[in-house]
């Protein structure tokens, strides 16, 4: 798109390409890959399925059940993926992961893509604290964080309001990236000792 004409679909596509490049560099150096809020992400079913990494997809049970039904209908193999039902707003996701076989002592790649904006600041902080406290020190966290002005714009769009009503979600967490976004991001990361 022409600069200034970008939309949310452009953001999602650019984010996916960028995250895929980071994942490609990291995947050979980890034992486990946790997709936090996996939704309909298909990374575990393509080339990465042959990486020898143990996959954990973490999301709400209803989303996972629908995804698994679609995967089965498409005859896509998924026995290498551990599905872990979690509500990030309520559950201790790392405890649920451990119950599913996750080993916190093994180097892990955590992907937290398109999730933080649906959580409160407290839920984001709690999730980051869990990863920091219980994951192996050499683990990697890839996450996206959104500008408050984007969240405000998305929240006003009628189509987004309908989707949020259907999913019983709200747009909540964001950061004030309008001025000096690098410093804002740096302060956020430092405040969580990441």
What are the roles of these predicted feature ranges?
Residues 1-34, 38, 42-194:
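Alpha-helical subdomain
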